[in-house]
C-alpha cells in the first residue's frame, strides 16, 4: 500500500522532488566521472605498441622491484627501465638488440622525444627507407622525414655533439624523432641493451626461463616503448592525485545529496503529519519515505551514471591537455568500467536512502496529536548520531593536525594528509551545522529584519543547515586547500632558492632537450675563476624513514626525490648540519635529518633502475620542503643528464669575473644551452611550479566547487519554495514584495556569513597547524593565501544563494 502512495506522491509532486533528483544525478555523475578516470589511470591506460609494432616477441628486463616476505611477493615499479643483463644477451644469440638513447639533430624543433637507435632495429616499428641507403660507417645516419641526402649535420648526444652525414630517410611515425646509426656506433653511444627482439618462439621461451626478464607480445609490447616507464610514473602520480580528488568530490557530492534529501523530507512534514492523523502507522510512514528516496535514488543514480559516461572522456582529455598525464591518456569503456559505475550507482542510492532514515523515523514516531504542531515548527534538537559523528570528526581532525604539527612535521607537505585533515574538520562542521548556525547568526539579531532572520533560523534549523552546508563545503575546502597548497609551495620554493642561493648564474639546457651534455659540463669546469656544480634530478627507492604517522603501506621501498651532484663546490648551497658534502662519492650519500640516520651509518637503497646499493652517510642536512631529502654523487643518477649547472664566480678582480662570464656564455652557446642569473632562474622555476600547482588545484577543487555551487542554488531554491505559506503570511501582514525579497536576501547573507565564519575557523586550524609543522621542519614560513580567489569564491557563493532564494519569492508572493 505505502509503495502505491510513494509512487503516487512522486507522480503528483514531481516538481518538489526535482531539486533532490537534480542534486543526486549531478552528484552521482561527479562520482562516476572521477571513478571512471581513476580506473583508467590505475589500469595503465590503453595504448597500442609504437616502437615495436612489428616485433613478434620483445624481451626486456623486469621493470619492477620484487620483494618476498611472509605475506607473499610485492612489487614496486622502477623509475627507469633497467638494461637487459649482459649474461642474458649472451645466452640469447638469435635475438636482435635495440638501444634507445638521446640523439637530436641540432636545430630540430622540440616535439616528440628525440631518440637514437641502431639500424638493425628499424624494422621493428617498422621504419622503411624512403630514400638513400642505410648507415654503413660510424659517421652516417638515417633520419625520419624530409632531409637532404649527403648533408653534414650535428647530432646532440649525452656525451656531446657529433658531426655526421645524412645518408637516408625513413617515413616518420608517432612516438619519437628517430636518428639511426650503425649498430656499432649505437653500442658505443649507449652500451646497455634496452630490449631484445626475436621472431623465434623457442628463443622467447628460453628468455622466460632465465628469470628476471619479461617477454612481451600483442598489446603488451607498448610496455617496451622508450617512454613507457615514464608514462607509468606519470600515471601512478595521476592515480594518487585522482584518488584525493575523487575523495574530495565524493565527500562534497554525498554531503550535498544528504542535505538536499533531508531538506525535502523536512519540507513535507505537514504531509507526513496528515498521514499519521488518518491512521498510518509509524512503520508505514517510515517505509513510504524510504521507498520514495529509493525510487528517486535509482532514477537519479542511473541518470548520473549516464552523465558520468559522457563526462569521463572529456575530463581525461582535459587532464592530458594540461600535461597531468601522458598525451595519449584516455578513458575507454571496457568490462573494467562496470565496477566504477556500480560504485557510483550504489553510492547514490545508499546516500539517498540513508539521508532520510533519521527524518523518516522521527516522522513515523510523531504522535497524531502532535502531528500538526510538528508540521509548523521543526524540532530544534540534533540527533545523537549526528552530534557524536560531528564531534568525532572534529576530534579526529584536530588530533591528526596536532600529531603532524608536533610529532611528524615532515608530513606537512603531503597532499593525502592535508586532504584527510581538511575533510575531517569540514565534515565535522557539516554534521554540527544545525547546532552552529544560531550562535553564528546572532550578529544579525537587531531590528525587525534581524528578528525575522533569527526566528527563521530558530524555527527551521534543518532548512537553515541545508542552505549552509554547500557554502560551508565550498568556502571551507577552498580556503583550507588553496591556503595549504600555496603555503607549502612557498616553503618548497624557498628550499629550492636556498639550494642555488650561493650561485651567481645557472646554466640550463635548451628547450626541448632532456638535459646538459657531460661534454658541456666538462668545458664549464675548465673555465678559470669560477666554481660550478652540475645538478641532476633523480630518484632513489628506499624504505620510509623510521616511523611515519599516516602512511601504512607494506614495508616496500618507495621513491624519494634526490639530486646527483658531480662535485661539492661553493656554488652549491645546502644546509649541512654534520659532516661534509666534499666526502660525496660513488659509495656515499647525504641525507636530511628527517631520515634519523647518524653520520657514518650505511643505508640500503635502490637506484632508479633497481640496482641495489649500500651508501655511507657522510653529511646530515637540515630538513627542507623542496622535495629533496637525498643527495648522491652524479654517478648514482643512472646516466641521467644534468638539469642545471650552478655557477659561482671567483673572488678575483672584476675583469677576471667578466672574462669568466664571457667564456661561460660562449661555451654554453656552442652547446645550445642558456646562461641566466640565479635570481631570475629561481623566479622562473617558482612561476613554473605555481602554474603546475594551479593546474593540479583546478582538478582537485574545480569539480567539487562547481558542484557545490549547484548545490547552493538547488538547496536555496528548495528552501524558499517550501516556505510559500510563511511568505504569504508576511504579505498579508503588509510586507511588500520587495521587502519580502529583501528579508530573504538578508537571511541568505546571514547564513552565508555563518558558513564563512565556520570555514574561517576550520581554515585557521588547518593553516595554523601547517605553519607550526613547517616551522619545525624547515624554519619560518609565512602563511600564503590567494585572497582574490577566496574572495571570488565566497562572493559567488553569497550571490548564488541570494539569487536562488529570492527568485521563487518574486513569483509566488502576489503583486506588490
Features from the language model and the residues they span:
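Interfacial "coupling" helices/loops that link adjacent transmembrane helices in transporter permeases
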Residues: 5, 9, 13-16, 253-298, ...
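Alpha-helical transmembrane segments
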Residues: 4-7, 11-12, 16-17, 21, ...
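Juxtamembrane segments of multi-pass membrane proteins
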Residues: 423, 435-593, 602
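Membrane transport/envelope proteins' first extracytoplasmic loop
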Residues: 2-254, 263-266, 288, 503-504, ...
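C-terminal membrane-exit region of the final transmembrane helix in multipass inner-membrane proteins
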Residues: 339-377, 790-816
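Short helix-loop junctions at transmembrane helix boundaries
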Residues: 305-339, 402-417, 758-796, 802, ...
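Alpha-helical transmembrane segments, especially those used as permease/efflux helices
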Residues: 15-19, 237-240, 253, 339-356, ...
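Short conserved beta-strand and strand-loop elements enriched in small hydrophobics
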Residues: 149-163, 599-615
